[in-house]
Amino acid sequence: AVADVIVERGYAGATTKQIAAKAGVNEVTLFRRFGNKKNLMRSMVQQEAMRLGGMDLDYSGDLEADLTNIVRVYQQLMVRRGHVLLMLLSELPKQPDLLEVTEMPQAQARHLGTILRRYQEEGKLVEEPPLVALSSLIGPIFMSAMLGSLEATLLQNLVEPQQLVKQFLQGRAN
């Protein structure tokens, strides 16, 4: 319900009353549990980040398999919640207090950066800031979503994980 209302009305335009109505609960219940709209948003983002954290995104020693796994997970995230993520990114310049909401996803990105750094240290990837490498790897997924291809099958067909990893490695593998 949080995602639907905020995507439809924007963060500033969404009210807890609208969110409660969409969720089929009393607004007072939302206030008791979350306190405010930002905490509702934080809870939703944390749930997605925990889902990402539980998807076995750890170093395995197999560079292509790890990169493909990262691409698949982000692709699934964009299919499931891309519209919310894009809305959140567009709202950050206008609502800087929302930056707190992104703490868990930022921690997940740093974790993935440590995996890429390890491959760099092993000489399997060129040296560059790990978050730059991560952005280069998953950037096409975000770009596809920004261009309006959030419809699940289109996004999945537009960005084929193994092909994306091969293209990424053409310029970055040692």
For each feature predicted by the language model, list its residue ranges.
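Amphipathic alpha-helical packing segments from all-alpha helical-bundle domains
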Residues: 79-80, 96-122, 131-135, 159
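Helix-turn-helix
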Residues: 5-39, 43
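Hydrophobic alpha-helical segments that form the core
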Residues: 126-148, 158-168
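Short hydrophobic clusters on alpha-helical segments that form packing/core surfaces
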Residues: 1-6, 74, 168
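Amphipathic alpha-helical segments used for helix-helix packing
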Residues: 45, 78-99
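Amphipathic alpha-helical linker/stalk segments
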Residues: 42-70, 79, 117
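Generic hydrophobic, amphipathic alpha-helix propensity
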Residues: 1-3, 19, 44-48, 112
